[in-house]
Amino acid sequence: TGKLSDIVVEGLDGHKFSLEYTDGKIVLNLSDTRDSESCVWTGEKGSVWDLMSTENFSSSDKMFVTGDELTFNDDATTTNVSVAEDVTPGNLYFKNNKKVYSLAGKGSILGEGSLNVEGTGTVYVKNTNKYSGGTNIKGGTLIPTTLANKDGLEYGSLGAADNTITLSNNGTLKVTAGMTASHPIVLGEDGGVINNTGTLILNGGIKKGAGKNRDLYKMGAGTLQLNSTADFDVLYINQGTVYDFQDAHFSGKTIVLNGNKVVLQASNSIYSSNSDNVNIEVPKGKSGVWYPDGRCDYTGKLTGEGTIDIYATWIRCPFNGNWSKFEGTINAKRGNKNAYEPVFDFNNTYGIPLATLNVDSRFTKDYSFCTNGKSFAIGALSGTGYISNGGNFGSGTNTLTIGGKNTNFEFRGSINGSSVVKNGTGIWTISSEDVLANAKSLKIVDGVVKLNKAAATASMTGPTVLYVQNEGELRGVGCTYGVSLLKGGILRPGSNAETAQTNNTGVIYIVKNLNAVAGSSIYVNKTKADSISVNAYTGSKTPAWAFLKVGGNAVLNGTIYVTYKDTWTPAVGDYVRILDCAGSISGAPTFELQALPAGLEWDTTPFLSTGTIRVAVSTGIKEVGLDGGSFKADVYTIGGFKLTSLMTTKANLMSDLKNRGLAAGTYIVRTAQGGIKVTLK
């Protein structure tokens, strides 16, 4: 006894048959069949795809027979296809552009044929299949429910684990759940897309086929985990994460971080040492995150104009490659402890002259951003971390040239053991004594270093003499050790640029000496009569003058520019402070002085003794003839009483007045060309 339905018939795949029980016998009936044809799915009779039963095809009998070449396009009435039993077609071609197709059902697609997606539309494959001719995604999107792997799932939606999936013409393989696949992936001409939302683990590897532009595009928020070697022309990570789990790296390849915070992660295998010359590009407007192998020599290029977060993941990961063409932002970060605390080893002299380097606060004295004794350029510098001249791959006094990106920036961390050169036209703001406290030196050759801490009492420019030269400028309020102002160098107390010079207030305190050679420039300013401005409502006090305070000596042979704001009304006897100098003032400076109101002129004679220049009565004639050699002078009191007459010269005037027994005070000296006010001390 038993049921016919319990009998399993083998070896007749692709043939229509039936079983019947007659006269005590089990009879196997085979149906006649036509030759295979090329036909199109119509779906006129519904969704069922079966063998020689349902008239849903454009074939001569409107049914499907084994070996038929099938095309699925936008002309079908029904696009939800139910595979009712095992079927063995020749090849399947999905040429839908507008309609969405879905293959489902209890039956499987068998045989040696291939499944080809050639339109621009979407195809879902939800059933389990066993065809072996490969899957070719030449456009559009193919979404399988399952993928086969050699660790538990023999067959999936796209056949067995060794059934190849080929991506070309920018076709998309989309996976909407986490899974593991052992299918080999081949990239054909114009490459393809893998779009996954969960974690897709590829054990079968990725290799290049024939053609050009065999690029792989990673889409979707999920992680694409590569457990075998991946070969491609270019990998574009547009979304999500690519995890190089197999530790084989991408030597010589180019990876483009082409999205928003997309991630490239290497297996952090600290027990094996590797070398990788992978090239990374971050286009303008894009951002990415890179977790490199913590024990690998990276020698590839970094290019682009976007933003990249690079994590230090261990202690033996030197970045030796040429990043000099990168014009974006590098956020240097520390990863989590992995046996040892990670450090960042920048280990080359190519530098990053066009990039902004942002050093994270987690880089400390013990776990630093290391420059390994290499001298190189940094386009702009920001962040709050610790930069060391040492490292695992070298040490020694190096030179960091900072500013060539020609942008304004501020760094709140610290530079240690390195000599520093400021270049570029931008402004580097320093707001703490700590930034350069342990640097070897600072030289400003272009642009501006702006001090931004009025209360500073220790040097903000390093523990040695600051050199300012070429087109460099020291500006702001704060403290510096000593200043050597060379040709082209500018010293400007106050926070404003030349265009707003008359608004400048505040003091630059020079602990030691100031030396300004010919061709250098010093700018000072006065905004009010008193040096301190008091707010009438709050009582708060702010500086009203911009000048220099020198703890040592000042030797000045450059040009001194004196300006004032219209909130100060100059009067006879007023003065402008240029220097408050504890030591001596010497030299032969040239003065460029803002014009005074009519009837007044500047008197620079007190400068070398007092660090000030004064406002005097003007005759309208330069120096009232005092620059013409010997002249006769009549001396009067302020009240107009004549005291004496004498022959003198400009150089000897003050001493000759004293020799006449005149007491300290203010007098009027008249010549044939006019008169001036002089003050004896």
Language-model segments: residues:
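Glycine-centered tight-turn motifs at strand-turn-strand junctions
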Residues: 642-661
